[in-house]
UniProtKB/Swiss-Prot annotation:
Organism superkingdom: Eukaryota
Segments of this protein annotated with the region Disordered: 244-267
Gene name linked to the record: cyk-7
UniProt-listed InterPro entries: BTB/POZ_dom, SKP1/BTB/POZ_sf
GO cellular component, one term: Flemming body
Bias-annotated ranges (Basic and acidic residues): 258-267
Pfam families, per database record: BTB
Name the UniProt record assigns to this protein: Cytokinesis defective protein 7
Coiled-coil residues: none
Length: 267
């Protein structure tokens, strides 16, 4: 895979009439820092005191927001400022959405950050990747739910609620949260979550309590029914035995008649 990317890189350099250099090396585990402008990455994204150079067409492919911003509203602008973020956060985000030459994989440490940016810039393909990653790991991690949210902090649930609050992945996360005791939730800073998520979690908790109560009542009803069946069976058996004994006794003559019969035989 890396060799194919390297060959592609050299072909691009040849197409732009630039001499290939031994300095151009594609390592198997390296990720670009986007600090240098190239003929195909001229668009500048500024954050704080750092600049990142990206392919605007790729941003437009991923994001309707950038497609409108860069090619409709401001087609001649060559710079975009991202605020409310740090340069390191922007760099991590770009590395996770761009093949330059390799795309950085999602991890439990960066998925919340990437999903937050993807929500902000309406990047549905990136949102889908993040959602799939969260769903796979939420179901495969330990059954210890507090351990789960040590790997997936509550920020992931917050980001998912902004992405698609009705998704199956969101349902999995809410179900996991509903299974955590209240005192453990407080240690996870649960109160900092959006109000609609908190309400959904507690609604799930209430429903769980009702379901458990219904199961206990159903179990008690089954035990009562089983006891009634046993009593009916025992009573029926007792009645049959009593009726049989009464029938046997009716066949034999009374004790007085037996003695009179014996005296007649001896005479």
């Amino acid at each position: 895979m890396s060799d194919n990317l390297s060959a592609r890189w050299h072909r691009i350099l040849d197409m732009t009439n630039r001499e290939t250099s031994d300095d151009v090396v594609i390592a198997r585990s390296s990720f670009d820092d986007f600090s240098q402008s190239t003929p195909w990455r001229k668009f500048e994204i500024s954050c704080g005191n750092r600049s990142f150079f990206v392919n605007p067409g790729w941003l437009a492919e991923l994001s309707p927001y950038f497609a409108d911003e860069l090619y409709v509203r401001k087609p001649n602008v060559q710079r975009y400022v991202i605020d409310q973020a740090t340069p390191d956060e922007v760099l991590e985000f770009l590395r996770c959405i761009t093949f330059c030459p390799m795309r950085k994989p999602l991890t439990v440490k960066n998925v919340s950050l990437v999903l937050t940016f993807a929500n902000r810039f309406e990047m549905r393909p990136v949102q889908a990747r993040c959602e799939n990653f969260i769903a796979q790991n939420a179901t495969s991690l330990s059954r210890d739910k507090t351990k789960l949210f040590q790997f997936f902090p509550l920020q992931v649930t917050c980001a998912m609620s902004q992405c698609d609050p009705n998704s199956s992945t969101m349902s999995v996360l809410v179900d996991k949260l509903a299974g955590i005791k209240d005192d453990e939730l407080s240690r996870l800073h649960f109160a900092e979550m959006p109000g609609d998520v908190v309400a959904e979690v507690y609604a799930q908790k209430i429903q769980r309590t009702k379901d458990k109560k219904a199961q206990r009542q159903a179990g008690a009803s089954d035990e009562t029914a089983a006891g009634c069946c046993f009593m009916q069976w025992a009573s029926s058996l007792f009645n049959r035995r009593r009726q049989r004994n009464q029938a046997d006794q009716s066949i034999l003559p009374p004790s007085g008649d037996q003695q009179h019969h014996r005296s007649e035989l001896h005479a």
